[in-house]
A protein has these predicted regions:
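Cytochrome P450 core scaffold surrounding the K-helix E-X-X-R motif
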Residues: 25-29, 58-61
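Active-site-proximal helix-loop-helix substrate-binding element of RNase H-like nuclease domains
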Residues: 42-203, 358-359, 366, 370-372
Length: 388
């Protein structure tokens, strides 16, 4: 593709800027990068690159063009710096693509039993921008730096058109829309041009070796992921559904309300019982529980437990877990741009409830077995057990 690069020139290569466009039926935002790339219909459509600050060239993989051998060598050579904006996306996606196509290149470029390209040798201008106090998105960084060439605005619509499946599950074919496809190729090329300008403008503020070491560690943590006990997750979600069904049925029996989950209906019922309250938030319910008894107190306790019966984290685990039951890509390096602290994605592993159950291993095993009756018998609150 483009000019021929001779082997002597390849040996002198020190840097390569690149950007890819991909497709997958998995929702990237909700299920994460690793699950996105693991999808059977995942593919790399376009790859644009520039060698050592040279001219940007596009490889139209969707229309049968192939990645040159020298580029595969570069991508799998830890001594060649691969520069991209949000480089983890390019690295993980290219890891999957090269493995699928059996284009493995240099063995030194792989780790984790050949699952991923090593993060050593990868450089992320998104992280570089964040450390400099700039926004993280390519578009926002370009605008903040007043770059000569900005990210093309048509890209968002074209990504939706070519990279996200239609309602029937199929993808639009580039060959059916040649003009739009050419625009998409130009968009891909422009992204590399914008990234190169960012890299050049921030040359005086490079990531230090110290920070690069942390970045590599972060990438390795994300690649290895954490093991998810999918049986426990599945049964926890089922237990929560059973608890909610029983609790709502009991609440209907107590109040006679059509929807005892409605704050307005419950407040009206409480007033009929001679109990006035402006709210049913956590603090208000706790205060009412100290001054009520009988059916009112039972209803408030049910209300309190229903408010705790959230299994969003379990549902997130279910969505993110890969085929090997590991959840990957849970940490965003330099996610808090003002402090440089990491942030979490998808499951929010840094924000799990504190454990207060003394025999937690037993409770965990009962949930894993799906033994709802035992959990209900042995513990005060099913939702509280599930939250821990």
């Amino acid at each position: 593709v483009g000019r021929v690069i001779h082997r002597t020139e390849v040996k002198q290569m020190t840097e390569i800027h690149f950007d890819i466009e991909t497709k997958s039926s998995v929702d990237l935002a909700k299920q994460g990068l690793y699950k996105y790339a693991e999808s059977p219909d995942f593919d790399v459509l376009l790859l644009s690159y520039a060698v050592d600050n040279g001219k940007v060239q596009a490889i139209d993989l969707a229309n049968g063009e192939v990645i040159p051998a020298f580029l595969i060598d570069a991508l799998t050579n830890p001594n060649v710096r691969k520069i991209a904006h949000n480089a983890s996306f390019e690295r993980v996606c290219m890891s999957v693509y090269l493995r699928k196509k059996r284009l493995l290149g240099n063995a030194d470029g792989w780790y984790s039993d050949g699952k991923f390209l090593t993060p050593v040798g990868w450089y992320c201008t998104m992280i570089q921008a964040a450390e400099a106090g700039l926004p993280m998105s390519l578009k926002a960084v370009g605008e903040a730096l007043h770059l000569k060439e900005q990210k093309l605005s048509e890209g968002k619509e074209l990504i939706q058109f070519f990279c996200v499946p239609k309602k029937d599950g199929t993808f639009n074919k580039p060959s059916d829309f040649p003009e739009r496809w050419e625009t998409f190729k130009n968009y891909n090329i422009r992204d590399v041009q914008v990234e190169m300008q960012i890299y050049q403008q921030l040359a005086k503020l490079p990531l230090s070796q110290y920070e690069m070491g942390h970045y590599i560690t972060d990438q390795m943590i994300n690649d290895y992921g954490i093991c998810i006990d999918t049986q426990l997750v599945q049964n926890a979600i089922a237990m929560n559904a059973k608890f909610r069904e029983q609790a709502l049925q009991r609440a209907k029996e107590i109040t006679g309300l059509d929807n005892p989950n409605s704050p307005l209906q419950v407040l009206g019922w409480l007033e009929e019982q001679g109990v006035k309250s402006a709210s049913l938030d956590k603090e208000a319910v706790a205060e009412l529980l100290r001054t009520t008894d009988g059916s009112v107190k039972e209803m408030l306790l049910l209300r309190q437990q229903l408010s705790k019966s959230s299994v969003k984290k379990y549902e997130a685990m279910q969505k993110v877990a890969a085929s090997d039951d590991r959840a990957r890509g849970l940490i965003q390096f330099y996610g808090a741009t003002k402090t440089g602290r990491f942030s979490s994605k998808l499951i929010q592993v840094q924000n799990l409830p504190r454990n207060a159950i003394s025999d937690l291993p037993i409770a965990r095993e009962l949930v894993k077995e799906g033994n709802y009756e035992a959990v209900e018998l042995l513990y005060d609150s099913v939702p509280d057990v599930l939250s821990q």
